[in-house]
Each structure stands twice: as structure tokens, then as C-alpha cells.
A protein has these predicted regions:
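Structural motif
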Residues: 45-48, 132, 208
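Generic, well-ordered alpha-helical scaffold segments in large soluble proteins
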Residues: 40-43, 47, 182, 231-234
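N-terminal regions that are enriched for targeting/export leaders
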Residues: 2-22
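A generic local structural motif
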Residues: 43-44, 127-129, 202-204
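Extended, Lys/Arg-enriched charged tracts that mediate electrostatic binding to polyanionic substrates
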Residues: 115-138
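Patatin-like phospholipase
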Residues: 19-25, 30-115, 120, 156-157
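Active-site gating loop/helix substructures
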Residues: 32, 96-99, 104-107, 134-233
Length: 234
């Protein structure tokens, strides 16, 4: 009878520990997801549960709502505040077609379609806000897919990162660009190209500088449409 060389470890002891707290994941799905998550956020706010969240992870259409919530977080004291600063702006977006005009502009004018999508988000929701305008707590994580590595590219106040490429601390990426990257549905709305240089990375995991320049990003749902990974992975 075969014998184990070493005792079998308890699975619970070897799995990465998840920090205690409430994590909220927002899936993709275009405007439908944007509005669904808006209603969910409102109800959680009314119940006093949203304020207890530790991390909020979003993908694609969910990132539109999540980023606006994060930007307005410090102003949300009452239900009326929530309607004024989050619900009404998102409703206005729902009544605006963004993708079709951006596609036409991308075909007829210089620049990529995703750049025109970002410009629309900037005008409608975010103005000049960047990832640094998100609150420290809860942590908002906006997810896209790195087309070059096929893995997750996360964007937050703390960092932008891909475990195959590296990490950039305290990024100043515009919120509109982060949301445009997260919702860059292929093939028409993607890629969103983020201009970066190897020197911007505080930690490097890639073997070649080619992966550290001009990161090509697509809809976060290509990798993980539920936005689960960045809730249980720090």
C-alpha cells in the first residue's frame, strides 16, 4: 500500500485568505447592466449596506455606474444626494447613444473608436476626474482585458496592474478612459490603447519592454464578465 511522503495539507490552510469585508461585483451587459446595477446600488444604499463595502469590482457596463458612484462617494449622505449625484446622471446617459456616433467618428476622423467613447463619457459623467479622485475606501476596481496577454488589467486608485506585465502605482488615468477601456466591446469598440512607458512601472513582471508600452485593452468581460477576480485577489 502506497504511503504519502508528507501529510496532505488542509485545503483551507493552503488557499489564499480573503480579507474580511463585503465585496460587490458588477457584471457587464451594456446599458442594461448599467441600469440594473444602479438600482442595486440604490437599494443597498437605502439599507445601509453599500456604505459597509470594502471593495467594489466592475466590468464593462457595470463600470459606468461604479465609476460614477466612486467619483461621487463623499457627497452621498442621503437618498436625495444619491439621486442627484448618481441616479439622474446615469439616467441621462441611458437616454444617450454613445457607441454609434463613436463608431462613425472613428471611421471618418483620426483616432480610435474607443477614444471617442471616452470623450463621450468625459462629457456626460466624469469631466476631468482621474482614478485618483476615487475614494481610498471602499476600493473601486475597474477591470479590462489586456489583449496582448489575454489576462486581466485592473485599474484603481491604488494601482494599474496585470500579473503578466507589472504594476503602476497611483495612476492618473482619466476615469472616462478607464470606463472606455472596461467597456471596449470587441471588435468595433476595441482596442482602447493606453500610452505608457516601461519607466512608469514600479514593479515589472514581463521579460520584454514590448509588453510595457502602449497597452491594448478590451472589454473586461472578455476575461471575466462577472468581475469576481479582483474581489478575492488583492
Amino acid at each position: 500500500m502506497a504511503q504519502l511522503v508528507e501529510p496532505v495539507s488542509n485545503l483551507a490552510e493552503t488557499k489564499p485568505r480573503v480579507s474580511p469585508g463585503i465585496g460587490i461585483c458588477l457584471s457587464g451587459g451594456g446599458y442594461r447592466a448599467m441600469l440594473f446595477h444602479l438600482g442595486a446600488f440604490l437599494r443597498l444604499f437605502e439599507l445601509g449596506l453599500l456604505q459597509k463595502a470594502s471593495r467594489i469590482s466592475s466590468v464593462s457596463g457595470g463600470s459606468i455606474t461604479s465609476a460614477k458612484l466612486g467619483l461621487e462617494w463623499s457627497r452621498l449622505k442621503t437618498r436625495d444626494d444619491f439621486f442627484a449625484h448618481v441616479v439622474e446622471p446615469i439616467r441621462r446617459v441611458a437616454g444617450t447613444t454613445i457607441d454609434k456616433p463613436a463608431i462613425v467618428e472613428g471611421l471618418l476622423l483620426p483616432g480610435k473608436v474607443a477614444d471617442y467613447v471616452a470623450a463621450a463619457y468625459r462629457k456626460l459623467l466624469f469631466d476631468g476626474a482621474t482614478l485618483q479622485d476615487l475614494p481610498e475606501k471602499p476600493e473601486f476596481v475597474i477591470n479590462a482585458t489586456n489583449v496582448e496577454t489575454g489576462t486581466l488589467w485592473r485599474m484603481s486608485r491604488q494601482k494599474m496592474a496585470d500579473y503578466k506585465v507589472g504594476e503602476i502605482d497611483k495612476p492618473t488615468l482619466p476615469l472616462a478612459s478607464a470606463v472606455a477601456a472596461s467597456s471596449a466591446f470587441p471588435p468595433v469598440l476595441s482596442p482602447f490603447v493606453r500610452r505608457v512607458e516601461p519607466s512608469q512601472f514600479s514593479r515589472r513582471y514581463a521579460d520584454t519592454d514590448a509588453l510595457l508600452k502602449d497597452i491594448s485593452l478590451a472589454d473586461g468581460g472578455v476575461y471575466d464578465n462577472l468581475g469576481l477576480e479582483t474581489v478575492w485577489k488583492a
